[in-house]
Amino acid sequence: MKASSLADFAIPINPDARLCVFRLKEQAFVNQRFIRLTLREPPHTDAELVHALLNSTLGMFLIEAAGFGRGLGVLDLNATKLSKTFHMLNPDRPDAAAAARIKAYFRPLLARSIRELPKEIACPDRLDFDSCIAEVYGFVGLEQGIREGAEFLYKIRKSAKD
């Protein structure tokens, strides 16, 4: 494998009830069960901030929207499609103080287990984290709609096993 195949982050290609993006401690190869994400401009890009943004409820909504339900209710993600269509919040937009606030609100989520998506997006620490992101990026008041959209897509996907 080429060094250009190293990942900074990984997303399972078939996540089930728990949806998240993993951050690797250092760049590494990932196997075929994961989609690799690589920072475009390391070391200038804040990997901790990118990790937080990818794991926001908006990030989870965008991941859910990029895939489709496959048997047993798992999400089927395609690396090629994701590389061409996936978007995320711009990590260069927040100033240093705002980026530090986002990361501070994200740390409690890292300190606990990930819950199933409907329970996860209702957790008080996640609500605070998402509110911080909405404030920094200027979409205050839209958080509930984003949560509802993420949960709606999740329920459609999970209904595939019923």
Tell me the role of every PLM-derived stretch.
Residues 90-162:
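Non-catalytic DNA-recognition/assembly elements of restriction-modification systems
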Residues 1-100, 104:
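Polybasic, glycine- and aromatic-enriched phosphate-binding surface used to engage nucleic acids
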